[in-house]
């Protein structure tokens, strides 16, 4: 966890903010152009603090009724090894539910975390969000 993330958590705790530190950094929405697709986005650092929220986001996306879920990691600045590993299980779970989980990363350090964990080969490479939605 970075110092910035830790300080952010402390500030939220002192202010009795009911949201977790990761609450403003992860979201999902159905695509307006491609109604069978759901876009999930993770912004900032995805470290051990946000891991449970990340798993919850992936689970919610699989149960939304969309045929395709595109996980957009272009704004993710750090991906911990456990979060990268969680993608392997999420890919299998999605497949069992009849959902295709696609990934757009864009950053070299995020790609490296995916390669180290052996997860990268499970996902086709999509250079942009649009190609992940249209293919």
Give residue ranges: language-model regions:
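A short, charged, Gly/Pro-tolerant segment at domain boundaries
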Residues: 11-12, 131
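Amphipathic alpha-helical interaction surfaces in cytosolic regulatory modules
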Residues: 45-123
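C-terminal alpha-helix
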Residues: 61, 132-135
């Amino acid at each position: 966890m970075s110092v910035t993330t830790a300080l952010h958590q402390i500030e939220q705790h002192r202010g009795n903010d009911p949201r977790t530190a990761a609450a403003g950094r992860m979201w999902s929405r159905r695509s307006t152009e491609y109604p069978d697709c759901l876009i999930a986005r993770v912004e900032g650092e995805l470290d051990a603090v946000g891991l449970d929220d990340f798993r919850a986001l992936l689970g919610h996306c699989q149960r939304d009724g969309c045929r395709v879920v595109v996980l957009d990691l272009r704004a993710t600045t750090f991906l911990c090894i456990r979060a990268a590993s969680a993608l392997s299980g999420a890919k299998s779970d999605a497949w069992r539910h009849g959902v295709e989980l696609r990934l757009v990363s864009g950053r070299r350090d995020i790609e490296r975390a995916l390669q180290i964990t052996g997860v990268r080969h499970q996902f086709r490479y999509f250079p942009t969000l649009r190609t992940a939605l249209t293919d």
